[in-house]
Amino acid sequence: MAAPAAGPVFWRRLLGLLPGRPGLAALLGRLSDRLGRSRERRRRRSPWLLLAPLLSPTVPQVTSPPCCLCPEGVHRFQWIRNLVPEFGVSSSHVRVLSSPAEFFELMKGQIKIAKRRVVMASLYLGTGPLEQELVDCLESSLEKSLQAKFPSDLKVSILLDFTRGSRGRKNSRTMLLPLLQRFPERVRVSLFHTPNLRGLLRLLIPERFNETIGLQHIKVYLFDNNVILSGANLSDSYFTNRQDRYVFLQDCAEIADFFTELVDAVGDVSLQLQGDDTVEVVDGMVHPYKGDRAAYCRAANKRVMDVIHSARARQQMLHAQTFHSDSLLSQEEAAAAGDRRPAPDTWIYPLIQMKPFEIQIDEIVTETLLTEAERGAKVFLTTGYFNLTQAYMDLVLGTRAEYQILLASPEVNGFFGAKGVAGAIPAAYVHIERQFYSEVCSLGQQDRVQLQEYWRRGWTFHAKGLWLYLAGSSLPCLTLIGSPNFGYRSVHRDLEAQIAIVTESRSLQQQLHQEQEQLYLRSGVVTSATFEQPGRQVKLWVKMVTPLIKNFF
């Protein structure tokens, strides 16, 4: 094995010589992870050769970055830091939430005690009484910051999608106008407009469907140095009976700074809501749908990548001085010097996907994780909308890990019971699910790849992400949590962000395991009989239309 390992070692050593070239370093890191794969491994990516795993009993050779290639030997996923900043934290600062009500109450509580910043990125803000409670909390905190004996400099920044946030007479914009009008120097509302919705298309496509072209889909809720990453939007159902996932990162200043800068960057290339309900472009910025598309996308790419590169450089410098230095002080010496920060046992990696701006970090990392999942590993993958990209489907079908995929039953799909064409969307998902299940069966992989449908009376399902259990382990060491759904839209159309959490902490692993179990306990295994149930018969027109529209949802 020494010879095959020589290539990856060589490339990895080159990374240390490229501190000022993160893009090239990331590319070399990617290459090093790919070197040494067998010919069979490379061929398996082809959809024509999905039978290869069935024809050969040998285990494909995988070159996951082993601990011996990482000087500090922390974990096998350190290759991700070749692409994005790595944040080392104590697991005691990470809390997994379980319910919409817990998510809602935590947000309100955090807004009330925020002193410096509140940053919220979401698809939209709803217009009901619960959403009004959030707005009232923001108003109260801003008011207190002005009237306090020692006034604070509290600033509020909100990033939403333009099309979704402008729909209807009463909408996200009208909900936030009072804040803008009362605190114009302290409140910023940015509305992202995809550069792909422009010209004649923008004029002709109906309001209800214009969001299919592309969206701001990032869900980050940040209060001073505390951050909630989720897939949940700011709407009443997400506070009551729409199941999602949520993780709370407490007292994580570097992570909070990163996501503040990311939201600021996207905000700078978005339209700015004014107190009279008009919108304006930031001075010097190309207009997203009136200006030159290529120039706008280049500017947006630079703005976002500057955030990623600068944060990555900061973290590399911090790690060189602390966790990753050969001259690292002992814990006793550090405590004596006044540094009481606990040693990290958990690592956070922000994964950004903005294909319109040619940023595809999340896609690269997700594909690599699926590719490197070895025989004996278990991957629990969940999505509220089962519409995997072809690349993800090929990897699920072509690798050796066990997969349990959790998806929404038609009754808990967010479009169930909708009026008009949208009411047929659950049936389209059933059709996609059945096609995938048929492919699993045709390859004889029912024991390795299992589909499960979530069902809960009176609830809908919106959870997404994955949990990775290494071979021989009963607890997950990695999870992905955030906004991506693993579908075409998430990869190609929308702006997405999630985090990879890698942990050696048994207590945090147990939290993640319990989260996974709670979701999967409310599911049933999909079999051929599932598609014979009443209500699962898909109309012919839906079957015919689905291939044409599946890239839009």
UniProtKB/Swiss-Prot annotation:
Protein's name according to its UniProt entry: CDP-diacylglycerol--glycerol-3-phosphate 3-phosphatidyltransferase, mitochondrial
GO CC term (a single one): endoplasmic reticulum membrane
E.C. designation(s): 2.7.8.5
Family statement: Belongs to the CDP-alcohol phosphatidyltransferase class-II family.
Record: transit peptide: 1-25
Annotated keywords: ATP-binding, Lipid biosynthesis, Lipid metabolism, Mitochondrion, Nucleotide-binding, Phospholipid biosynthesis, Phospholipid metabolism, Phosphoprotein, Repeat, Transferase, Transit peptide
Entry binding sites for ATP: A121, S122, L123, Y124, L125, G126, T127, G128
One BP annotation, GO: cardiolipin biosynthetic process
Subcellular localization, as worded in the UniProt entry: Mitochondrion
Active site: H217, K219, D224
Role of this protein: Functions in the biosynthesis of the anionic phospholipids phosphatidylglycerol and cardiolipin.
Catalytic reactions of this protein: a CDP-1,2-diacyl-sn-glycerol + sn-glycerol 3-phosphate = a 1,2-diacyl-sn-glycero-3-phospho-(1'-sn-glycero-3'-phosphate) + CMP + H(+)
